Amino acid sequence: MKKFFLTAAALMGAASMFAQGWPANYEGVMLQGFYWDSYRASKWQNLEAQADDLAPYFSLVWVPQSANCTSSERSMGYDDLYWFSNYNSSFGNEAELRSMISTFKSKGIGTIADVVINHRKTLTSWTDFPVETYRGLTYKMNSTDICSDDDKGGTLTWANKQTPKVSLSSNKDTGDDWDGMRDLDHNSSNVQNVVA
């Protein structure tokens, strides 16, 4: 799963650079605009206020995951619940995020976002992902998008006790198991569609 995440992040970063017309032999410098538990230091408004200071030295600022987690104001974003419809995070709201990106862009700084696509939080039970609509398309993950060995088999045990029984994917996790949230089956065409 780690290899998949790193590969996906690298590809998305490379794709966005080409989409912005950056040269193939890009030699810019990226600043990581966050560190663990940097809720205050990495707020969108704080990063935006530093744009003039950053512009002479950095071409990109890597920002933390921006989707809503609903857990608390002290989440680094790795317990993401909403991917498309709610960008209110520990770092600020959607308007502040857009303002930061716009300011960075006006100063010649690109923005690259950390993304979490290997696991996802659910609403109230182990398998109820939120339904989201983005640009006219509705996205829904199902119990069959969860790896069969999620939570060291705990999710399967839970699923088998439900009436009616809840089905999971027949595929095992392709990375490390993490029992904090549901591990997603990246061999699932639905997961691939939602992630892409």
Where are these regions (language model features)?
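Sec/Tat signal peptide C-region and signal peptidase I cleavage site
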Residues: 12-19
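Substrate-binding/active-site clefts of carbohydrate-active enzymes
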Residues: 21-29, 34-52, 56-196
